[in-house]
């Protein structure tokens, strides 16, 4: 019986020993907390200083957990940060050997004195941290407090290079009620921590430098400022905004290549202009309504709208020239020289003047007229009263050749002329009238074709000008942000005026 009870007693003794040790450890921590927070020796409303002139040094460091958003239009940056604060409280000290070598204890932060460090440039009225976590207190009185916070801070948005922009959003921390004669804020690290940072899909973190600011005119002022230097990832705006704008603008190039007879020049121009206006309205809803600067995309849209407006004006001029005729306008000699001879060669254009059948006939007729081959179509017989006339074979052949027809054989003996009836004079006059009328119409058509060719040359000239300005203007605008030297020094030393004391 004694042998059976021995193992059971051993197990019961071991269990009681563990229970007593756990209760003993819990009792030790409870005794320590009661000792530290005893109202007779500790008051959380009093600054932990032995005298009024002693400074309480508070070490501060920001750990960025997440860059939630940057609202450009409202100029607000929302961040999830952990605000590390360390200081010493001589009242929260103990001897570890008196409390089972317990060197650290966690105390509710609302039961101890806290430096009232708040975000000064807050944008929504939430100056405090989101959650009052426990503070870790060491036996030597050093306190480590790491509360999480979601801050909405005011951020001045620079829209000059949007969407290839880089922003500098600052977060200024300062004690709300204590000044430099009571609390000395010190940077724990020169840069904010990114150990627990979750990458953002819209922004890249360039640098997170911190600095301690003092006011030489006010010896009681001190604050800790962190510069959040962030660069936008432009892929989203490039795909959804810039590339469609470039493609729509390239459609305006086709306006100058479109024939004037089709009647769609003005329709295409106005359609492109309306599409660009829609994109301009989208931009106005994204960027802040500031008059200090114009965003890069806005500049490009205005640039393209000016080009499209220019294409509308030139299309009106081209259509006006295209529909000119000899009855309304006379072509000046310098117009013929410039637009029919000089510019076509420079624009790599070649007028098919010598390859058209009508043009070949026109040139042959003019050559015959210069040679005098058709000077006289008929000649009268001797005697004014005679009704006899003679057909001039050479004149008939010359006139036929002038119009590109084979001369008909003339019956009769091999003389130069033969007598004919008196009614032939009237027939010859009618033929002469028809020939003169056809010659006049042919000349008018030639002038009209010259005006159309002048319009074509003007169209081609403006086409090259538009392509040149559009391509080089686009490249020059969107390469401009790449040549900007974004350095941390530029942001840190730009317009940092001395802050005013509270």
From Swiss-Prot:
Q: What is this protein called?
A: Neuronal acetylcholine receptor subunit beta-2
Annotated site residues (Key residue that may interfere with effective access of the conotoxin BuIA to the channel binding site) in this chain: 84
Assembly and oligomerization: Neuronal AChR is a heteropentamer composed of two different types of subunits: alpha and beta. CHRNB2/Beta-2 subunit can be combined to CHRNA2/alpha-2, CHRNA3/alpha-3 or CHRNA4/alpha-4, CHRNA5/alpha-5, CHRNA6/alpha-6 and CHRNB3/beta-3 to give rise to functional receptors. CHRNA2:CHRNB2 and CHRNA4:CHRNB2 nAChR complexes exist in two subtypes: LS (low agonist sensitivity) with a (CHRNA2/4)3:(CHRNB2)2 and HS (high agonist sensitivity) with a (CHRNA2/4)2:(CHRNB2)3 stoichiometry; the subtypes differ in their subunit binding interfaces which are involved in ligand binding.
The record's Gene Ontology biological-process terms are: acetylcholine receptor signaling pathway; associative learning; B cell activation; behavioral response to nicotine; calcium ion transport; central nervous system projection neuron axonogenesis; chemical synaptic transmission; cognition
| Residue positions with a glycan | 51, 168, 485
Check the UniProt entry and state the signal peptide residues, or none: 1-25
Membrane-crossing segments per the record = 239-260, 266-282, 297-321, 459-478
Hey, which stretches end up on the Cytoplasmic side?
261-265, 322-458
Please give the chief subcellular localization of this protein.
membrane
User: What is the recorded membrane topology of this protein?
Assistant: Multi-pass membrane protein
Disulphide bond pairs: 155-169
Sites annotated Key residue for a rapid dissociation (K(off)) from the conotoxin BuIA = 136, 144
- Role description: Component of neuronal acetylcholine receptors (nAChRs) that function as pentameric, ligand-gated cation channels with high calcium permeability among other activities. nAChRs are excitatory neurotrasnmitter receptors formed by a collection of nAChR subunits known to mediate synaptic transmission in the nervous system and the neuromuscular junction. Each nAchR subunit confers differential attributes to channel properties, including activation, deactivation and desensitization kinetics, pH sensitivity, cation permeability, and binding to allosteric modulators.
Which reactions is this enzyme annotated as catalysing?
Answer: Ca(2+)(in) = Ca(2+)(out); K(+)(in) = K(+)(out); Na(+)(in) = Na(+)(out)
Extracellular topology ranges? 26-238, 283-296
| This protein's GO CC annotations | acetylcholine-gated channel complex; cation channel complex; external side of plasma membrane; membrane; neuron projection; neurotransmitter receptor complex; plasma membrane; plasma membrane raft
Matches recorded under Gene3D superfamilies:
Neurotransmitter-gated ion-channel ligand-binding domain, Neurotransmitter-gated ion-channel transmembrane domain
Quote the subcellular location field of this record.
Synaptic cell membrane; Cell membrane
Question: Carries keyword Isomerase?
Answer: no
Could you tell me the keywords of this UniProt record? Cell membrane, Disease variant, Disulfide bond, Epilepsy, Glycoprotein, Ion channel, Ion transport, Ligand-gated ion channel, Membrane, Receptor, Signal, Synapse, Transmembrane, Transmembrane helix, Transport
Task: Quote the annotated effect of residue 218 to A.
Answer: Reduces CHRNA4:CHRNB2 channel opening potentiation by divalent cations
């Amino acid at each position: 019986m004694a042998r059976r009870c021995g193992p059971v007693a051993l197990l019961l003794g071991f269990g009681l020993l563990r229970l007593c040790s756990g209760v003993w450890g819990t009792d030790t921590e409870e005794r320590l907390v009661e000792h530290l927070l005893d109202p007779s020796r500790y008051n959380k409303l009093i600054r932990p200083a032995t005298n009024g002139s002693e400074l309480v040094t508070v070490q501060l460091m920001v750990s960025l957990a997440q860059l939630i958003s940057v609202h450009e239009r409202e100029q607000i940056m929302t961040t999830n940060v952990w605000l590390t604060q360390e200081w010493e409280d001589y009242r929260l000290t103990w001897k570890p050997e008196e409390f089972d070598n317990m060197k650290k204890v966690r105390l509710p932060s609302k039961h101890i004195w806290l430096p009232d460090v708040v975000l000064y440039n807050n944008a929504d009225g939430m100056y405090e941290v989101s959650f009052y976590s426990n503070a870790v207190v060491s036996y030597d009185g050093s306190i480590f407090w790491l509360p999480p916070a979601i801050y909405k801070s005011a951020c001045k948005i620079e829209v000059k290079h949007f969407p290839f922009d880089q922003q500098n959003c600052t977060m200024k921390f300062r004690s709300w009620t204590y000044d430099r004669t009571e609390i000395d804020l010190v940077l724990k690290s020169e840069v904010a921590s990114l150990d627990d940072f979750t990458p953002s899909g819209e922004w890249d973190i360039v640098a997170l430098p911190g600095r301690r600011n003092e006011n030489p005119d006010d010896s009681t002022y001190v604050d800790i400022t962190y510069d959040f230097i962030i660069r936008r990832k432009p892929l989203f705006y490039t795909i959804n905004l810039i590339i469609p704008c470039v493609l729509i603008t390239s459609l305006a190039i086709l306006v100058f290549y479109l024939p004037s007879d089709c009647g769609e020049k003005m329709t295409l121009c106005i359609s492109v202009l309306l599409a660009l206006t829609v994109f301009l309205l989208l931009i106005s809803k994204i960027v802040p309504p500031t008059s200090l600067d114009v965003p890069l995309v806005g500049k490009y849209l205005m640039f393209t709208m000016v080009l499209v407006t220019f294409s509308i004006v030139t299309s009106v001029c081209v259509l006006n020239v295209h529909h000119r005729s000899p009855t309304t306008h006379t072509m000046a000699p310098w117009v013929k020289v410039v637009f029919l001879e000089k510019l076509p060669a420079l624009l790599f254009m070649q007028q098919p003047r010598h390859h058209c059948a009508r043009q070949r006939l026109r040139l042959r007729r003019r050559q015959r007229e210069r040679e005098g081959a058709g000077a006289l179509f008929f000649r009268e017989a001797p005697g004014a009263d005679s009704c006899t006339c003679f057909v001039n074979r050479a004149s008939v052949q010359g006139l036929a050749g002038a119009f590109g027809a084979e001369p008909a054989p003339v019956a009769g003996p091999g003389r130069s002329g033969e007598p004919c009836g008196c009614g032939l004079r009237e027939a010859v006059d009618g033929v002469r009238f028809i020939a003169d009328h056809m010659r006049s119409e042919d000349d008018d058509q030639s002038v009209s074709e010259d005006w159309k060719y002048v319009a074509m040359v003007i169209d081609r000239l403006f086409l090259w000008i538009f392509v040149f300005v559009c391509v080089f203007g686009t490249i020059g605008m969107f390469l401009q942000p790449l040549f900007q030297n974004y350095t941390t020094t530029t942001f840190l030393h730009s317009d940092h005026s001395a802050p005013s004391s509270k």
